[in-house]
Amino acid sequence: MVVAHKTLPNRRDSVRALWEKRLAPTVLDNPGHLAYYYGLDSDDPDGITAFQHYRSAEDALEFLRHPAYLAYEREVAPLLAAAPEVRRLVPTWIKKET
């Protein structure tokens, strides 16, 4: 899953701080997340993109119901310029570490 956020002007640091407070610990403790990348857009000072690789579709749905995620969603909404753009992907090839 790829989630692209567009923050209100000059609010990206606030969104990042909220993500680090609410979601980073939850992601670290979530066995359903096989990988999670949180990235700041180099070309857009208000852009954030998260790449999430879940073990299963059920794990993704479970995470979206987690109390920390629901709290984050409520708190971050006023800081965003628009609703996040969500793309669901089916991994078809993954580079494995050797």
Sequence positions of predicted segments:
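Short, well-ordered beta-strand segments in beta-rich or mixed alpha/beta enzyme
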Residues: M1-K6, A35-L64
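Residues in well-ordered beta-strands of folded domains
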Residues: A4, R87-L89
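Short, surface-exposed ligand-recognition loops at beta-strand->loop->(often short) alpha-helix junctions
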Residues: K6-R16
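Residue-level signal for secondary-structure boundary sites
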Residues: R11-D13, E58, I94
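An amphipathic, aromatic/His-enriched active-site/gating alpha helix that lines ligand/cofactor pockets
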Residues: K21-L34, H53-R87
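Short, low-order "capping/linker" segments at domain edges
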Residues: L89-T98
